[in-house]
A protein has these predicted regions:
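Long, contiguous hydrophobic alpha-helical segments, chiefly transmembrane helices and signal peptides
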Residues: 26-27, 56, 83, 92-96
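A structural motif corresponding to the C-terminal end of an alpha-helix
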Residues: 55-64
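Alpha-helical structural signal in soluble globular domains
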Residues: 20, 59, 82-87, 104-109, ...
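Hydrophobic faces of well-ordered beta-strands that scaffold small-molecule active sites
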Residues: 2-8, 25-27, 63-69, 89-93, ...
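Active-site-adjacent beta->alpha loops and helix N-cap segments on the catalytic face
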Residues: 33-56, 73-78, 95-113, 123-129
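Catalytic domains of carbohydrate-active enzymes, especially glycoside hydrolases
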Residues: 7-32, 86-87
């Protein structure tokens, strides 16, 4: 089986993707530090907003919806509550460095949704066994 992943905040594209088996839609709300990390690189930074979560979820019958939040910060709990209220099926934690950060995020999520831990930092990779 193959899982397909599409980052979008476009309802029409979400509807088309929803017809495909194994599809996961992905709303990207990460903004904290992203511009600084990607300065000088030929990358695209999304302009997704929290309202996009509900707009995309409303288009889906089969596909699951994942939302990438900001790295752990004082507003994480409020961000999480907002996206879960709009129907996020899973949440992603980016840019964490330590197992303690991931555990803190897990405590905030408190079993309300599956967590996707994005292993994109050297600290995160070193902490895999923890």
């Amino acid at each position: 089986m193959m899982e397909l992943l599409q980052i979008t905040n476009d309802p029409a594209l979400a509807r088309r993707c929803d017809a495909l088996p194994g599809m996961r839609l992905f709303v990207d709300l990460e903004t904290h530090g992203k511009a600084e990390r990607q300065t000088g690189r030929n990358t695209f930074i999304t302009t997704h907003q929290s309202e996009d979560v509900g707009r995309i979820k409303a288009q889906l019958q089969r596909a699951r919806l994942m939302v990438r939040l900001n790295p752990l910060h004082p507003g994480t709990s409020a961000e999480l509550d907002t996206v879960l209220a709009q129907g996020a099926d899973s949440v992603m934690l980016p840019m964490f460095q330590t197992p303690d950060e991931l555990r803190a995020f897990s405590r905030i999520v408190a079993g309300r949704a599956p967590i996707v831990a994005l292993l994109e930092t050297s600290g995160a990779l070193r902490s895999v066994d923890d």
